[in-house]
């Protein structure tokens, strides 16, 4: 039985991934904000974590360490957005929050759990199509997600051959992320994108749903991707073709 830790497990993609991995026999450890875990209880071991708080990360890591197991997989889904605005109109507090929540916190939580990984383990991070296909108003988020790609490739080199490290980079996904984010809002804010307009401009005619993302993540966790590291899988229905 493989053991997989998922940071951001209570979000829209995370909940589907928990169910899929559990159904396939994996031992899943879910980590997320306490508010998220209360709002969306999961049928697996759940540990509260706030990736913006180093003490919280240390506490969560120590709890996992106390379980006396090795992680075969680590998926870091954490992240959120704070609306759409041009960079020149963005205040520093919003910029800092965006970088902290989408890059620094992801780096810190991944770094602390990394020593618990098993030999030949797999780490999957979550970037975004915006890291390469820039859209006005999403600059800070795009900068953070471009950093995730750089982090992923760096870890892939530095941790080889012991670990594989890859990323998925979705376009917009039909989850609460588009309406404020799980755990950091009531999940009922106005959608940050025009879904119909974006869907009509996408070759496959819609935006993603969670299973469009969880399938590639499970592939990257599995032995089927055993000769892949430092790679980015773009999941966007053809909206961006590198």
Kindly label every feature range from the protein language model.
Residues 128:
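Residue(s) in the substrate-gating loop at a strand-loop-helix junction
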Residues 110, 144, 152:
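Active-site helix of classical SDR
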Residues 169-180, 184:
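Short, flexible catalytic-loop segment of classical short-chain dehydrogenase/reductase
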Residues 2-27:
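Canonical Rossmann dinucleotide-binding motif of NAD(H)/NADP(H)-dependent dehydrogenases/reductases
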Residues 85-87, 91-99, 198:
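Substrate-binding pocket helix/loop in short-chain dehydrogenase/reductase
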Residues 84, 218, 229-242:
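Short C-terminal tail/terminal secondary-structure segment
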Residues 115, 157-161, 226:
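Alpha-helical segment proximal to the catalytic Tyr-Lys
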């Amino acid at each position: 039985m493989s053991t997989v830790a998922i940071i951001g497990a209570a979000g829209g993609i995370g909940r589907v991934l928990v169910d899929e991995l559990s159904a396939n026999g994996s031992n899943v450890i879910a980590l997320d904000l306490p508010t998220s875990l209360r709002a969306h209880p999961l049928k697996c071991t759940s540990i509260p974590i706030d990736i913006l708080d180093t003490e919280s990360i240390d506490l969560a890591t120590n709890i996992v360490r106390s379980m006396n197991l090795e992680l075969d997989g680590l998926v870091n889904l954490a992240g959120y957005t704070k609306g759409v605005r041009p960079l020149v109109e963005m205040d520093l507090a919003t910029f800092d929050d965006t970088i902290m929540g989408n890059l620094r916190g992801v780096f810190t939580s991944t770094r602390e759990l990394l020593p618990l990984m098993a030999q030949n383990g797999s780490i999957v991070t979550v970037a975004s199509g915006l890291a390469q296909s820039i859209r006005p108003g999403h600059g800070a988020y795009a900068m953070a997600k471009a950093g995730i790609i750089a982090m992923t490739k760096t870890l892939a080199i530095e941790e080889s051959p012991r670990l594989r490290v890859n990323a998925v980079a979705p376009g917009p996904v039909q989850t609460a992320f588009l309406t404020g984010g799980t755990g950091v809002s009531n999940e009922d804010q106005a959608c940050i994108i025009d879904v119909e307009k974006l869907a009509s401009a996408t070759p496959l005619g819609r935006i993603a749903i969670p299973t469009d993302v969880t399938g590639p993540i499970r592939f990257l966790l599995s032995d089927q991707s055993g000769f892949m590291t430092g790679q980015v899988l773009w999941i966007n229905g053809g909206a961006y073709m590198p």
